[in-house]
C-alpha cells in the first residue's frame, strides 16, 4: 500500500519534495498529503500552501535560556527536565482524507 502522507522534518524540505511528487504525475493533496514542521513564511508562498506545525521558537528560546542560567547558577543541583512547548497548526492546502 503506498503512503498517503509525507511529514517533512521542516518546511524547506517540502519545496524539494513537492517537485519530486509532481514529477511522478501525482497531485497534492488528491493523491498524497504533505505536512511540514516549522511554520516559515515560505511555506505559505508555495503552491499549494503547505499545512505545517509552527514551532513556538520564542518560547523555546526563553525556556532554554532560563534552564541554562539555572545550570550555571546551581551546577550541583540542576536537574534535567523534559519541557514541552506548544505549537500552532497552520492549515494550508496540502492535506485531505485519502
Give the role of each language-model region.
Residues 1-98:
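Flexible loop/turn connectors
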Amino acid at each position: 500500500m503506498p503512503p498517503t502522507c509525507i511529514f517533512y522534518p521542516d518546511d524547506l524540505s517540502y519545496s524539494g519534495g513537492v517537485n519530486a511528487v509532481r514529477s511522478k504525475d501525482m497531485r497534492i493533496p488528491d493523491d498524497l498529503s504533505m505536512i511540514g514542521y516549522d511554520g516559515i513564511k515560505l511555506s505559505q508562498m508555495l503552491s499549494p500552501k503547505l499545512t505545517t506545525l509552527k514551532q513556538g521558537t520564542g518560547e523555546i528560546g526563553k525556556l532554554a535560556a532560563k534552564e541554562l542560567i539555572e545550570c550555571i547558577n546551581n551546577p550541583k543541583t540542576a536537574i534535567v527536565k523534559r519541557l514541552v512547548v506548544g505549537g500552532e497548526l497552520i492549515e494550508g492546502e496540502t492535506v485531505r482524507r485519502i
